[in-house]
């Protein structure tokens, strides 16, 4: 009897261990890289007087992705819960790596285009015919909107351009370090990311430590290593909308790199010609990022670095973001973004809101 009891316990423990290991090795979505957009189709089943739309999805998955794995997406709306289903390019990767894929849009088939606008749902799933499995790895919701195109004439009254509302992104920023091209993680630079609604013209980033601007290096009368910003995600319509639409229904995530502000330096190269580096791990305290957009102050972001250089606030981990970027609230100033929904962040990441995050006033 005792032998039987011990055997049952061992089998249960073994099964529990296998289950735990299996769960830890499942692929996960990098949430801030999920980007759902609307692809406008310039006909409705051959009728070019009416435009429709199809969903397009770009996302990244943390490995592992095993042999035989196939990522796919289901999209639906009220009355058509499984409107379209489409496969996404899928490779084989190990744990610790990620896979980027884009799918949907015209590849779904233009004949499946819809004129529906309003709330939609979508699910990222993974099946494996070899293993006989089919699982859900992300569920989301979004809002589809439309406006007339910028065309003129009696035949274009139903030429609508479609897009997904991404206002929820605007109050959410990211602070993180990136490795040097030569020294890797032994020498890191400060990066700050944030969203704008509109075009990314004339961006001038600045960062302050305890109220004093840092990262400015001047050599022979000229600034060197000037920080710069560029978009790493661009969400825009596939066709031009009418001029009355705020910022042309365009959202960009800007990434600003500070080449003279370092997270750490273990490269052993010394200070060099331009003097001591500014090292965040040697300068704990309060930092503030400011961006001038078209010569006007448009964003501020505050964060605190602890002794040793850590500035993580735990929001990304608690929210299962899928990467180690630090999430911070963004103060939005001025009117360059136009009219936007200031409560949209509560449904951030397509209905997967952040844990412990409060938007800046």
Language model: regions and residue ranges:
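Bacterial N-terminal signal peptides
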Residues: 8-19
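Positively charged n-region of N-terminal signal peptides that target proteins for export
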Residues: 1-7
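Alpha-helix boundary/interfacial micro-motifs
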Residues: 19, 23, 302, 311-313
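A detector of low-complexity, intrinsically disordered, Ser/Thr/Gly/Pro/Ala-rich segments
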Residues: 2, 15, 35-38
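Low-complexity, Pro/Ser/Thr- and charge-rich linker/hinge segments at domain boundaries
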Residues: 143-163, 308-327
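Contiguous segments within soluble domain cores/interaction surfaces
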Residues: 24-135, 164-290, 299-301, 307, ...
């Amino acid at each position: 009897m005792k032998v039987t009891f011990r055997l049952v316990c061992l089998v249960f423990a073994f099964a529990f261990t296998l289950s735990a290991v299996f769960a830890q090795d499942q692929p996960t979505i990098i949430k801030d890289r999920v980007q759902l957009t609307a692809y406008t189709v310039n006909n409705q089943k051959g009728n070019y007087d009416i435009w429709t739309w199809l969903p397009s999805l770009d996302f990244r998955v943390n490995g592992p992705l095993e042999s035989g794995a196939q990522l796919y997406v289901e999209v639906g709306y009220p009355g058509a819960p499984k409107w379209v289903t489409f496969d996404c390019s899928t490779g084989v990767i190990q744990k610790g790596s990620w896979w980027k894929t884009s799918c949907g849009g015209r590849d779904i088939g233009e004949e499946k285009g819809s004129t529906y606008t309003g709330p939609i749902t979508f699910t990222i799933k993974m099946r494996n015919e070899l293993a006989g499995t089919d699982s859900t790895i992300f569920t989301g919701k979004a809002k589809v909107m439309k406006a007339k195109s910028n065309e003129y004439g009696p035949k274009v009254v139903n030429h609508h351009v479609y897009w997904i509302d991404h206002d929820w992104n605007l109050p959410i920023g990211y602070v993180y370090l990136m490795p040097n091209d030569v020294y890797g993680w032994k020498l890191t630079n400060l990066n700050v990311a944030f969203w704008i609604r509109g075009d990314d013209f004339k961006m001038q980033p600045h960062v302050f430590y305890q109220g004093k601007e840092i990262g400015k290096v001047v050599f022979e009368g000229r600034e060197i290593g000037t920080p710069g910003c560029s978009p790493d995600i661009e969400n825009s319509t596939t066709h031009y909308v009418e001029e009355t639409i705020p910022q042309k229904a365009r959202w960009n995530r800007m990434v600003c790199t500070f080449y003279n502000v370092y997270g750490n330096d273990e490269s052993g190269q010394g200070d060099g010609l331009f003097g001591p580096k500014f090292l965040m791990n040697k300068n704990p305290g309060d930092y503030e990022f400011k961006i001038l957009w078209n010569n006007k102050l448009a964003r501020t972001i505050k964060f605190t670095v602890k002794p040793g250089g850590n500035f993580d606030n735990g929001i990304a981990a608690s929210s299962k973001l899928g990467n180690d970027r630090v999430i911070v609230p963004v103060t939005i100033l001025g009117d360059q973004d136009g009219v936007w929904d200031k409560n949209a962040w509560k449904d951030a990441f397509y209905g997967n809101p952040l844990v412990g995050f409060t938007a800046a006033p």
